[in-house]
């Protein structure tokens, strides 16, 4: 298991059913963290490392701000996106100056090639070996990561609140998002728990395998 310590100046990790007020989770869901790790290593196929375990923890108590912004909608297919009724103002919550830890464990990845865990380590230690494009974000493309540090043993630099699986937990976060509809979206139930060391591997949410695999 390895981890990354990250700082993100501005982000919104949108709650799945947020509508008029676009509320944010206090930390990025496993699906968002998985996407960010794929981006770091330059992987464009999100199926590539299914089966790994990923989660996040928050090191501080970031401020939550509310802003007014324009969101695109699909009310009228005859009108261009972002125009007329296909755009409307909404309030959005933003997480300000978040300090995070993102864990990754690849021992359950079925693919025999280089694991996501190993690729993350290589990307941090040998950035010139990675081919990628664009900024590195944790969520929307504007939610850029400012600082990143490898924690090779997975131990956080200080106590943090981590999202860990728990059958009786009160928090449900996506581990896989269906970007076409909602049918294929998968969730994990857990809770935020204070950790001082690398968490138990089996309590990290697992990115689900494709149907029929494994």
Curated annotation (Swiss-Prot):
Induction: Part of an operon going from at least MXAN_7266 to MXAN_7259 that includes a CRISPR operon with transcription continuing into the pre-crRNA locus. The keyword ATP-binding does not apply. Keywords: Antiviral defense, Fruiting body, Sporulation. CDD domains: Cas5_I-C (cd09688). Coiled coil: none annotated. One of its GO terms (biological process) is sporulation resulting in formation of a cellular spore. InterPro entries: Cas5_Cmx5_DevS, CRISPR-assoc_prot_Cas5_N. Disruption phenotype: Essential for sporulation, decreases sporulation 100 to 1000-fold. Negative autoregulation by this gene product relies on DNA both upstream and downstream of the operon's promoter. NCBIfam families: cas5_cmx5_devS, CRISPR_cas5. CRISPR (clustered regularly interspaced short palindromic repeat) is an adaptive immune system that provides protection against mobile genetic elements (viruses, transposable elements and conjugative plasmids). CRISPR clusters contain spacers, sequences complementary to antecedent mobile elements, and target invading nucleic acids. CRISPR clusters are transcribed and processed into CRISPR RNA (crRNA). Has a role in fruiting body development, sporulation and aggregation. Belongs to the CRISPR-associated protein Cas5 family. This is CRISPR-associated protein Cas5.
